[in-house]
Amino acid sequence: MAKARSRSAATEPAPGYANVPSAGNSGPTVPFCQGSKPETEIAYSWAKIEPSANAQVLGPIALPANGYVRNVWIEVETTTKGKEEAATIAEDMPFSIFEQIKLTEPNGAPLGMEMRGFSAYIANTLGAYAGSPYIENQIEFNKGLNEPRFAIRVPVELTPNGLGALGNQSASAALRLTLTVAPLGPAYYSAGKYEAGKVPQFTIRVIMELWGEPPERDILGRAVQQSPPFEGTAQYWSEQPSVTINKGLNQTRITRVGSMIRTLAFVFRETGVRKEGDKVANTGASNLQVQWDNRVFRTQTPFYNWQSQQEMVERIKERKKGVYWFCFSQGENRHAGEPGINSWLATLTSTRLELLNTAENAGTVDILVNDVSVTAINPLERTQQIGVGGYHPPVGQVSNVAA
């Protein structure tokens, strides 16, 4: 009689599965973005929001404690149409409906974004996070005064594999979102007004895009990476608003340094209105230059700058008057926003970073900086200082029969 062959650890099925390798011979670790799955969750909504003479602060709201935040989607729908009276729509509409969009740590420290609505539009478009990032291509987009309709994201994740996604598993230490609706006036129209009692009403919805918490092992018993790649990496969008541009030579200091810069954008204005002369912006300057420490390393004509937007931002239809950028995230496919870590601009807190231009007229410039921090901090310190996310509190073991 033949002797029965014993079953080794390599052939023994994992508990709960038939003919599945055990955890002891599981092979390589499964990447986070394969073990986890993208999810969405309604975070909050406000109904019957009607602009008035005063700004309206909505929030702060705590994002639902769930997984790792990828982005925060903010959707504006007109539920009661308005009726304007000989009004001329403001050039930054409909994005200027938001006087401020702010994502923060539990203690109020800025995290991810803190800027005005139009600046957030620039961040979405020139930051190039979506496959087609030009917001005005949205299927429901409407910029009209009487029935605006659009959506805008607070970008958190840098690349679709989870890089930059922020842990948000604790309800007592959740990320917070605050929206400020602009008062009636220049944010909506440059002339005219709404008829009395005919101001539109909005519903504003917030959807959290996230990665779910992955199981410790997959169905084949392989170990799954439990957090996004390079956990602790975080990006920020910040704004230096209304910096004075004088007639003549300007050397304007960019104050947000100390991390790796992914995108720089500039919005030139004259008396609050985006404007450009025959050459560049409201100032009529012949070139835009960026000085990095002791050398000028980017010099561009206006046409070159505008053309780079068209070439690198997928399906962009038109450039915005007075808006210029310098991209440090061009990927191998020649598009902005792709993995291009080698092109991020490294800075120190002592780095001299300046915008140089010669102005024919005085005005202002809004400086938008998208920088990436790659230094993780102790999760216990997350609510005590300006952190970089990656919070992962102690939790029970994930239930999985193959563990």
Regions found by a protein language model. Give the residues of each.
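Short, low-complexity Pro/Thr/Gly
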Residues: 2-403
